[in-house]
């Protein structure tokens, strides 16, 4: 009889919260924020009332979970007041940094910031760390690896890049962990798209294909959690050998519901090598 005691782990995955404020002075109205603030005024602000975010926090507080993942776009315009509002609202969920993983999205690096003044790092850096990759070890031989692929772009681009140094650091980690370790990658950008989706290279990862191929070559990577495109989904990618890759999109968790929407975020339960992904609707 197998005497091994199975331990389960539950992850809450939310994304693209888009906390927003408007620029308050001329310095904040720089470059791309003009375009973003216009979009916010005429469209996004009405889609993201603060009450929805508070409702999300209250719902998660009542759920049973071991780890919280936020896969980017905490803010809309990467303004300090936006980050401050995000931190204040999410604070009830962030009491134990060891139970939280947060990676930045393109809206969190919306414009170039002065050296040493990265606002994502100021308000949420403790949930990523100062290394090239973020690492959190979970129960039962599971581990979370967070990537930072967000960087400022020109006016017409919202793309990101997974750096070679990020892939190398992850490669080194995989090689030095026990063979039975299973990994979850958290990154802002998707690797797959819904059927019929019109791909835009200026909106996705610049190096999407090589990154996706790299992940598929490493069967110990079992899950890829992301956001960016505001449609929840669970996709599956087969491998030539080894278990399939599950890709979970939880964007956008705080937006108003659209017609026939079935999911706002996901709860992911891990038990031994088994994965169960449950969609959760924020009514």
How does the language model describe each region?
Residues 11-14, 19-22, 35-38, 101, ...:
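Metal-dependent phosphoester/phosphodiester hydrolase catalytic core
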Residues 8, 64-65, 97, 178-182, ...:
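A general structural motif
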Residues 18-21, 76-79, 106-114, 152-157, ...:
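Active-site environment of divalent metal-dependent phosphoester hydrolases
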Residues 13-15, 67-72, 99-106, 148, ...:
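Active-site neighborhood of phospho(di)ester-bond hydrolases with catalytic His/Asp-centered motifs
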Residues 84-172, 177, 210, 241-250, ...:
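Extended active-site neighborhood of metal-dependent phosphoesterases/phosphodiesterases
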Residues 200-271:
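Conserved beta-sheet core of the metallophosphoesterase superfamily
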Residues 7, 270-283:
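A short C-terminal boundary segment appended to hydrolase-like catalytic domains
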Residues 1-83:
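N-terminal active-site segment of His-dependent metallophosphoesterases
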């Amino acid at each position: 009889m197998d005497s091994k005691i199975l331990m389960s782990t539950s992850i809450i995955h939310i994304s693209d919260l888009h906390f927003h404020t408007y620029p308050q002075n001329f310095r904040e109205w720089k470059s791309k924020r003009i375009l973003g603030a216009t979009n916010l005024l005429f469209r996004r602000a009405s889609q993201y009332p603060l009450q929805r975010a508070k409702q999300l926090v209250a719902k998660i507080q009542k759920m049973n979970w071991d780890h919280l993942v936020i896969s980017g776009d905490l803010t809309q315009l990467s303004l300090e007041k936006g980050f401050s509002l995000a931190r204040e609202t999410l604070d009830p969920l962030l009491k134990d940094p060891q139970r939280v993983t947060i990676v930045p999205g393109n809206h969190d690096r919306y414009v170039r910031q002065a050296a040493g003044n990265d606002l994502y790092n100021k308000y949420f850096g403790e949930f990523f760390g100062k290394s090239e990759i973020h690492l959190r070890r979970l129960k039962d031989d599971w581990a979370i690896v967070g990537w930072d692929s967000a960087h400022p772009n020109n006016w017409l681009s919202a793309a990101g890049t997974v750096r070679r140094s990020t892939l190398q650091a992850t490669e080194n980690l995989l090689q030095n962990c026990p063979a039975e370790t299973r990994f979850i990658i958290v990154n802002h950008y998707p690797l797959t798209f819904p059927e019929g989706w019109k791909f835009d290279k200026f909106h996705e990862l610049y190096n999407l294909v090589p990154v996706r191929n790299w992940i598929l070559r490493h069967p110990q990577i079992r899950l890829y959690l992301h956001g960016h495109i505001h449609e929840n989904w669970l996709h599956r990618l087969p491998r030539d050998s080894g278990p399939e890759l599950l890709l979970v999109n939880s964007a956008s968790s705080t937006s108003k519901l659209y017609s026939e929407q079935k999911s706002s975020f996901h709860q992911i339960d891990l038990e031994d090598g088994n994965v169960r992904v449950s969609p959760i609707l924020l009514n």
